[in-house]
Amino acid sequence: MTETKSITLPKAADSPGIGVPQDGTSSGAAGLSDASPLLVAAMTAGYEVVGSAPAGLPPGGAIGVASGISGPETEIVVGAIGNGEPAAAKPQKAKIRAKKTKPDAAGAKQAKHDLAEGKLAKHDVAEGKQAKPDMAVAKQAKHDMAGGKQAKPESLGAKEAQPETAGAKKAKTGTGGARETKPAGAKKLKAKSAKHAGAKLPAAKGGTPKDAASAARAAHPGKAGVKGARLKGGKLKIAKKGALKTAKGIALQPESPFDLSDSQWYLNRELTWLEFNRRVLHEAIDERTPLLERLKFVAIVSANIDEFIMKRIGGLKQQFGAGMHELTLDGRTPRQQVIECHTSIREIHARKREAFTEVRALLEQKGIVIESYATLIPKEKKFLREHYYANIYPLLTPQSIDPAHPFPFISNLSLNLLVTLRYPRAKEVSLARVKVPVGLGSPRFIRVGKGDHFIPLEDVMMNNLDMLFPGMHIVACEIFRVTRNANTEKDEEEADDLMAMIESELKERRFAPIVRLEIGSGMEPLHRGRLAAELELDEENDVFEVPGMLAMRDLFELARLDYPRMHDPAHHPIDHPQLLTTRNIFHTIRDARQILLQHPYVSFSTSIERFLREAANDPKVRGIKMTLYRTSSQSRIIEALLAAAQNGKQVAVVVELKARFDEATNIRLAEEMEEAGIHVTYGVVGLKTHCKVILVVRQDYSGLRRYVHIGTGNYHAETARIYSDVGLLTCDETIGQDATELFNYLTTGFMARRNYQALVPAPRLLKKALLARIEREMALHAAAGGGLIQFKMNALEDGDIVKALYRASMAGVRVDLYVRDTCRLRPGIPGLSENIRVVSIVGRFLEHARIYYFRNAGAEEYFISSADAMKRNLEARVEILCPVIAPELTRELRQIFDTYEADQRSAWDMRPDGSYVQRHPADGESGEGTHQMLIAQAERRLKESLKMKKKLPQR
């Protein structure tokens, strides 16, 4: 007897979702609502259409596909179909009969085989719910059959697809309707490189990759009629018992030849971050970089490695010290990671010394000299001795190291002299420690003689120790430096007072375990061993002997010297073309609806600071709310908030006290604001508040109106000049409502169900939204081709996102990733990631913006976010994903991606083994990097705007 099953999708819900205007018009929003790819995918899987398509079915529609259909004959009943058209009164039917033939070239297997093998995905096992991408919520078939319930259409703010549980088996996916995912003769790659935990992988192909967007548009010219899918709450109902196990909003796909749980497909987070520092160090070597900028990059790498040792190595040592041996996604234990990181750090240090030696010699030719004490003339030595006695000697505190005196406390990152001395007639020697007083107004480099000649402070001290130890014989003087663990966080759920707990952590951090000892070359082995023992370090692994200068991060002092020709060309951020006038900024935003800000190309002062300054003084402004993660110590942002409170406005600030290395500043600012009457809260217990949001409520002519700023970067005037970020000024009603919901959550911590219509917050929804959109792009690509995903972020570390991108590549979707530093994904592996490119931009500014793009069958979606694709951002922080819809703004974001693609100066292409190769301009090509091009684009937009204003009639 023939077994028959039906799937019914009733009329779609009317509630708009992310990126959907309130008037119901399509803007390329979020999901799947049309119908014909169901038939396409079923035929791909080996089914034959024997009836006519449902009445009203558009030729290029798309709906979720019921994967796992089995049985000799299946009926598919389609209700709401088309692009928002109402459903027919009586649903039409299309019959599909399974063929006894092999799958097509895509390698898609029949669902019956999938069921027999038990390899269908099981999402939300605990709750028995089907994944709910975007706005459409379809309960799992098995759950519906058991309970007889039907899911109500929900907006994006409702619950979305839960990430796969650890025990759930992953769905085997591949290329639907395309070529075989496993190339002919391809063999499973075996892990070989201990450094990168990877396989012996093919080298990256030469040449510059083609424009992905153009390639995607050209891929299927005959299918331009396929419109972007939208999730509008279609309800999935299983009308008959049978073997249908799951219903997913993706096309049927072949079984993957790659085991995505295999560690060889993933790179190590720590090692890829260190690889990023090799690219930064290359800027110090590159002769195209101005000389003092090269010195700056030496200092940057030194500071980066210091912070890495404090945060990452310190944390890893805590793990294996506590007996933790859990493997990472790439198959390493904490101890293995520390050992390999130390090896990489030693290599970077060696290369850094070579770079510094070269730059130092070139600077000498320009008259900037770092002297050694031995080369000074007597007159200069006399000057330095007098300077030492007057300005350094009073700050010194020598400490003896002997049985009568305990080993002294050594502060984090401090330079220290270990002095060996004895009395003139004594044979025994004694040891003393002297801290080099760098900081708090004391420079590391002292100017000597005429011109720009400098000598390190420690050199001056070493050669004038007789003043500090009169009557003693100085036997030797050696230098060392320590680095302490910065991971001292406590469980804030157990704290009665969060601020008091953070203050306690700061005190403990001063005395945290030491994780690295750096010593100058030539230190006595006995002294080296004694220091390691006193500091409780492994002498073999934790002690770094450094030839030459220690603490090269202090070279920032010299890199700031005023030599314009040895710096990058001066850059002065422009005023945004729409913010040039002195007109009330709220009137400007109201007329423009949305304004996109690109920092540092657009002035932070005349945009964001002005926004807050005018809000503080505008009599029509009723309230101001904002999040504060990092800001400068003398901040105009804080001044504006204090002024607003003094002017009687309601001001609420969510201060993140746990912003690493900014805790003390944030505590001081929080106390200052509380004293001024500002409502200060510290976010949600257990989560860091990392989103960047300002909400201003103003009494407009039509009632209260909400004005919002959402950004990817901190409200920090200094970093806004050197970090590349984007932000959005808007008075969009939906975004304003969502911002209000967000602040209600942040100021109370209540986990009540909140209905977000435009914004997508983490940790509840953001990761699910990204995964759902990746799956949707796969489904649309299977139906019509031309799939394209582009992400711009600082780091790609989350395992679920990486696996989803692998599946997208195997399905034929083009994936362009612009990732600044950490990237766990291996691009360019045939059959697995051959459709993925990873590019890192390293140049004048620090890339910091997060932009997410989905082609969505032509109804493109753009988002900006405070979140990277990292587990901590997506699951342990409060973040925001914000849609950018206005065509004039999406054109700007598209121009950013196109600029990255055109970069032949500061772009690095990632190879499958985790290494990178820098692009170089061919003959006749521009040698400008991304940042130079974006500066020129911003200035060009300003000039065009000024020309247009001159043409307008004067009022």
Regions found by a protein language model. Give the residues of each.
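Hydrophobic alpha/beta core scaffold segments
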Residues: 814-818
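N-terminal localization/anchoring segments of enzymes in phospholipid and broader phosphate metabolism
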Residues: 2-24, 28-51, 64-68, 73-79, ...
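Polyanion-binding catalytic cores of nucleic-acid enzymes and NTP/SAM-utilizing transferases
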Residues: 801
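Positively charged, lysine/arginine-rich intrinsically disordered segments
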Residues: 42, 74-75, 83, 109, ...
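Long, intrinsically disordered low-complexity tandem-repeat regions enriched in serine/threonine/proline
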Residues: 91-96, 100-213, 218-238
